[in-house]
Each structure stands twice: as structure tokens, then as C-alpha cells.
């Protein structure tokens, strides 16, 4: 066996070695990484390796299976490995900081990787402090048109408020948003920008959507994590008895599923109309919009639990036919049946799986607090 094959075999054994963490990407957690940084000593996935290529002074990558590895490189990988290197570069990641997963957008992964290895923000000797107040300009989509305009945003973390102004030196904010009602989620495809962020909050019983971006990836991710820090501060005050580990999933959330379906009205005789749907698992709401970038939803369906009589059925009620799309599903609530059609069987399966996941899960502490506050 030549050096090439012998070293490839050693690397593949390292990927499987127990207690190393090498079986998942060191940066996003994707399973079965087949690339590695021989300068840092970590195994990474193909997508994250593309980010590493952007700073060759700090990281240099090779394919585990396709590239040639000399003995010294393999020795370096053997003496390091994912868990060992993560212990160094992720020693002090703040609780509020969003650590991206494999399914997250590129800007989150890129800034996480740069923060770790290039800026070395999370080393043991670095002091960790919350971002605090923040002020700056973001490009915001107009409520009634598709034009993005430069707007000044101000985050007051201690007061738990986010404000934005239409005039750069304006004294009166266009909106004052309470952090307790705020969510932020990257929606790059929907917004059509690689740094696109969707901020939502409750306004007069509806969900107001703000679509923003910044030309700098670092700037938009810093804004995102500053909002998360303010959210965590609020949650600690709202739930003083809950451990931080239970609060972290409540800081911000992504939609469980989004996409187009067609819906009919409460009598099931109304014409089916195409709408954009977004499933919010934490607030247990299925929101629908005329268009994906609308400022407000047209309506929503609250999703309780199976124990409360909420169900989702595959298919349409007998005698009901969709408009263009023939496959569908029916959501049963104590008040009525909601009937939807899906463009494909794949979409139908994904909606059924997502909806059933919400209906089978217990209500979160945040939702229980919101419900008790409303009933009180």
C-alpha cells in the first residue's frame, strides 16, 4: 500500500474514531464530513470548506478522499480533531449567540466560521459581554411597495425596545417594537438577498413583517445576535425559575415550513385561492399571506394540541375538489375544518409531517405565559 492509500485509510479511520467529534462537521454539524482543514486540524463539510478557502492565512483545506495527504498532515489531524479544536476556539461562546446548523443560510455559517478562527472571538482569554445597545442603518423593504430604503434602527437592550426611523436624524420613530413580541429569522431566498433578515412583531393583533438587509454579512449577523441577546435578557426576567438551557430555544425561531398552498373558505364552497403559508411552531400558528413579502398576514390558524381536539388529515373532505392542485390536507380545529391543496405530493407530505409535529408537541412556556396573560 502506497503513502497515498495508507494516509487516506488513516484519515477515514480518524473520521470514525470515538470521542473525537470528527464524524460531524466542526462548524455546522453536518454528518459525514469529507473535507478537512490541515492548518486547523478539523474535519468539515463541503459547504463550510468553501468558507475556509476565503482565508488561506488561517485555514487550508483538502478533500479527505480525493487529495494527497503527506504523513505530517495526517499526524497533525491525529493530534487535533474536532472536539479538541472546538474546545480551544469555542471556549466562551455566549449563550445568546446563534450557532448555525447544516440547514442554515451561508451568511450565518460564514460569520460563525470567521468569528471563531479569523477574529477568535470565543477564545478562553477573551472577555464575553452582551452586545448591549446598537444603532445603525439597514435597508428596509417598504410596507406597500417592493423598494428597499435606508432606515436608521436603534436597539435599546435595557429597555427591551427596537426602534426605527424613516429620517436619518428624525426624533420620532416610525415604530417602537417590544423585544418580548419580536422574532428574527434569516430569509435570504424569500427576500432575494444573501443577507436578508425578517423581523416580526405583534401589532394590533396581527403579525407585522419587516424585511431588511445590510451589505455587510458581519453587520447583519451582529444585528441578529444583538436582538437575540436582548431577547434572552427579557426571557430571563419573564421566566426566572427556568434554566438557561430551556430559554435558548425560545430566543428566536425559524419557520418550520413555508410555501404556497390553495385554501377555500369556511363553507368549503368558496373558490380555492393561492396563498403563501408560514408555520410558526413556537406560537403554534399557521399564517397565510397573499404574497410572501406582505407586511401583514391575511389570516391565521391557531394549532392547539391533539389532546385539545386538533388534528390534520391527509386529503380533502368528500365531495370537495381543489382548483388546480388535486392533493391536499384538512386541519381540524374545535371551530371548523380548514381545507388546503398542495402543488405536489412531496409538498403535501412535508406539510403533513410539519403540522403533525406541532399538534403532537406540548405548549411551550412562552406560549403558556402568552395565553394566561390574554385570558387574565
Swiss-Prot record:
Keyword check for Kinase: no
Effect seen on changing residue 151 to C: Almost complete loss of InsP4 binding
GO molecular function, one term: phosphatidylinositol-3,4-bisphosphate binding
Subcellular location(s) of the protein: Cytoplasm; Cell membrane
Pfam families (alphabetical): ArfGap (PF01412), PH (PF00169)
Effect the entry attributes to changing residue 275 to C: No loss of InsP4 binding. Almost complete loss of InsP4 binding
Domain of life: Eukaryota
Residue ranges constituting the Arf-GAP domain according to the UniProt record: 9-130
Family annotation (InterPro entries): Arf-GAP_dual-PH_domain, ARFGAP/RecO, ArfGAP_dom, ArfGAP_dom_sf, PH-like_dom_sf, PH1_ADAP, PH2_ADAP, PH_domain
GO cellular component: cytoplasm; intracellular membrane-bounded organelle; mitochondrial envelope; plasma membrane
Tissue: Expressed in many tissues, with highest levels in fat, heart and skeletal muscle. Also detected in kidney, liver and lung.
SMART domains: ArfGap (SM00105), PH (SM00233)
GO biological process: heart development
Domain PH: 131-232, 254-360
Alphabetical keyword list: Cell membrane, Cytoplasm, GTPase activation, Membrane, Metal-binding, Repeat, Zinc, Zinc-finger
Main location: cytoplasm
Zn-finger region bounds: C4-type: 25-48
Function: GTPase-activating protein for the ADP ribosylation factor family (Potential). Binds phosphatidylinositol 4,5-bisphosphate, phosphatidylinositol 3,4,5-trisphosphate (PtdInsP3) and inositol 1,3,4,5-tetrakisphosphate (InsP4). Binding of phosphatidylinositol 3,5-bisphosphate and phosphatidylinositol 3,4-bisphosphate occurs at a much lower affinity. Possesses a stoichiometry of two binding sites for InsP4 with identical affinity.
Entry protein name: Arf-GAP with dual PH domain-containing protein 2
Origin species: Rattus norvegicus (Rat)
Gene: Adap2
